[in-house]
């Protein structure tokens, strides 16, 4: 069932936070030595979550950035979690207090619970959105911790308890929500096995010491502050009480989605309430649900355990700890949904007992098949919204038009698709909704730049810099626009600022160098090329570009055939002498050095490779260059102006 519901996700591209957490995450590029992948970059979804980062490193080792492997592993994790949930529910329904009522039906009831939880559309964000593997993997470890603990309660084998502690430790290093796992194991023992906390600790205090010790792992990871910009108590615009009050209607919304999973939203953009009265109904309703759970835990503890499961697992993200970027997120319901499903399935079983005996089994089986089929279909349909970033953000804006982030990100996707007028409309809407939305100003500037409206773009970038003066991307774009407007001196200042703000970014220096070279600032460009080469010695692009400049610049003062040959040979070595563009540069360098015979030989090799690989445009250029060398003339050409401009902007 899981494969049927998620088979259309295997080609879903990387989205939003996948870029920082996977695509741009250098820590997953190598499995050895392991220290790098165990130290994921800060301010990303994998920050402080080394176990999840290791799984991404394994994916990268097996298939690079091919999304297929990532989605297969995400689905495998989800299916395994459903299987473990099946085991937990079945074992629980066979405990002494429940066996008489549910023991005979434990397996089919557990199967229905697991299937509904597996195919429920509310789970799509945790499975289809690749980087949210942190949620599903944590969920798997959470369930494995409880399953091993349950088996250990009735077994003489110590390995079940050891397994519980081991999985708990892995979960703590996967996501912070795992913090409640030792408490849930303790509560389960008290409610379903031992009958009292005194009896729990009398029988088996040692496993709980081990489980509690895993909090040290979590504390150590949290202490590094990897997401201090997005999670914490120090935000002036997000007080603890306000955040907690906002969670009332949000959690109520989660419960509604559990029963009616429409509409599902990728990014809610839920805003902080401006007045308490606005959230009062939701807060009162959730207070009632919470109070009922507490009372049930006291007077009907087996029922109350479901409420405790729901609220304790949601607590780290949906109570008093402000998460600035997301007040609401569907992936937070990954594990809490299980409590709702168990309650509904067991409740339906109780209702079904009122039917005539001959009707019970077919009615129950029929209802289960219909519900699972409908939920599976809805999940498959929802997964279709993930097929491209443009589709996803279009869907999000349609459902949440007041979400400034969604408006901004839809604008960026439209810009990338060449639909600049539409993109600018959405950027302006994002700014209307949030006048201090710095990324929208920056992104609108890039769209205006692509339309050739450089003066207007500079105005937009200037507003972005007022909001965030240390934004290297904005300085870079301003520099480009000023170059196009003739303000070379001011442009150089902004380029220098962009470089200073990114002291280890070779790409930024390469782009600045290529742009400056295109506008005649050769000395400045040469310096940035050399910095890029020092920062990333095995990257051929800056080496090749500097070689091209030294070989072909129209001003003899900047040409140097000997240096050009040395640089071009290095670029060819880095590309295995198989890249037509580096061979083209080497041929030009030999021609500048006066060795036209070698220039012809290398150019012919480049032409052969380009022809065999269907690079028609490159074939045309190489043919022109080859004709020059055969007539004993060197290549003289200014660097291509348009090439270095990268209108990436800022998404969020």
Positions of PLM-derived features:
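Polytopic membrane enzymes that build or remodel cell-surface glycoconjugates and lipids
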Residues: 1-456, 462, 468, 473, ...
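Structural marker of alpha-solenoid helical repeat scaffolds
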Residues: 399, 433, 467, 501, ...
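Conserved alpha-helical positions within TPR/SEL1-like repeat arrays
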Residues: 405-416, 439-450, 473-483, 507-518, ...
């Amino acid at each position: 069932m899981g494969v049927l519901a998620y088979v259309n996700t295997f080609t879903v591209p990387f989205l939003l936070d996948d870029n920082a957490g996977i695509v741009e995450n250098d820590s997953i590029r190598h499995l050895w030595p392991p220290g790098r992948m165990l130290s994921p970059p800060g301010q990303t979804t994998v920050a402080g979550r080394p176990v999840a980062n290791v799984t991404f490193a394994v994916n990268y080792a097996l298939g690079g950035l091919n999304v297929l492997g990532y989605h297969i592993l995400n689905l495998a994790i989800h299916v395994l979690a459903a299987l473990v949930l099946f085991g937990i529910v079945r074992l629980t329904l066979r405990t002494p207090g429940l066996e008489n009522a549910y023991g005979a039906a434990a397996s089919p009831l557990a199967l229905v619970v697991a299937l509904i939880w597996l195919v429920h559309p509310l789970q799509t964000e945790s499975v289809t959105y690749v980087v949210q593997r942190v949620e599903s993997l944590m969920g798997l470890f959470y369930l494995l911790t409880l399953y091993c603990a349950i088996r250990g309660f009735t077994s003489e084998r110590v390995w079940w308890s050891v397994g519980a502690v081991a999985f708990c430790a892995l979960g703590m290093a996967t996501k912070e929500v795992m913090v409640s796992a030792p408490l849930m194991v303790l509560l389960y023992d008290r409610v379903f096995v031992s009958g009292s906390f005194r009896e729990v600790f009398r029988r088996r205090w040692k496993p709980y010491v081990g489980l509690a010790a895993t909090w040290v792992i979590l504390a150590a990871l949290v202490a590094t502050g990897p997401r201090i910009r997005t999670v914490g108590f120090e935000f002036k615009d997000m007080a603890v009480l306000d955040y907690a009050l906002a969670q009332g209607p949000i959690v109520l919304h989660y419960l509604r989605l559990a029963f009616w999973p429409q509409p599902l939203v990728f990014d809610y953009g839920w805003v902080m309430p401006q007045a308490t009265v606005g959230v009062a109904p939701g807060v009162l309703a959730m207070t009632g649900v919470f109070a009922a759970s507490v009372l049930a835990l006291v007077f009907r503890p087996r029922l109350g355990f479901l409420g405790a499961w729901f609220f304790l697992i949601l607590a780290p993200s949906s109570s008093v700890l402000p998460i600035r970027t997301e007040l609401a997120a569907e992936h937070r319901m990954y594990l809490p949904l299980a409590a709702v499903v168990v309650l509904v399935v067991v409740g339906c079983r109780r209702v079904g007992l009122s039917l005539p005996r001959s009707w019970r089994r077919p009615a129950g089986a029929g209802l289960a098949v219909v519900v699972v089929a409908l939920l599976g279909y809805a999940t498959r349909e929802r997964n279709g919204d993930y097929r491209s970033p443009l589709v996803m953000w279009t869907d999000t804006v349609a459902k949440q038009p007041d979400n400034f982030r969604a408006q901004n990100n839809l604008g960026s996707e439209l810009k990338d698709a060449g639909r600049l007028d539409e993109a600018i409309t959405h950027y302006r809407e994002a700014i209307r909704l949030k006048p201090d939305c710095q990324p929208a100003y920056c992104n609108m500037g890039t769209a205006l730049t692509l339309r050739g409206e450089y003066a207007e773009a500079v105005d937009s970038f200037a507003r972005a810099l007022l909001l965030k003066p240390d934004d290297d991307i904005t300085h870079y774009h301003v520099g480009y626009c000023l170059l196009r407007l003739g303000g070379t001196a001011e442009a150089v200042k902004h380029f220098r600022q962009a470089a200073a703000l990114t002291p280890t970014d070779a790409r930024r220096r390469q782009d600045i160098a290529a742009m400056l070279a295109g506008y005649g600032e050769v000395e400045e460009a040469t310096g940035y090329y050399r910095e890029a080469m020092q920062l990333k010695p095995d990257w051929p692009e800056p080496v090749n570009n500097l070689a091209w400049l030294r070989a072909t610049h129209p001003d003899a003062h900047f040409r140097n055939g000997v240096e050009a040959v040395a640089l071009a040979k290095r670029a060819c070595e880095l590309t295995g002498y198989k890249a037509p563009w580096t061979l083209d540069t080497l041929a030009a360098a030999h021609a500048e050095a006066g060795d036209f015979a070698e220039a012809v030989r290398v150019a012919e090799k480049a032409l052969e490779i380009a022809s065999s690989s269907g690079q028609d445009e490159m074939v045309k250029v190489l043919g022109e260059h080859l004709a020059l060398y055969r007539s004993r003339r060197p290549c003289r050409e200014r660097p291509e102006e348009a090439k270095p401009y990268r209108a990436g902007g800022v998404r969020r």
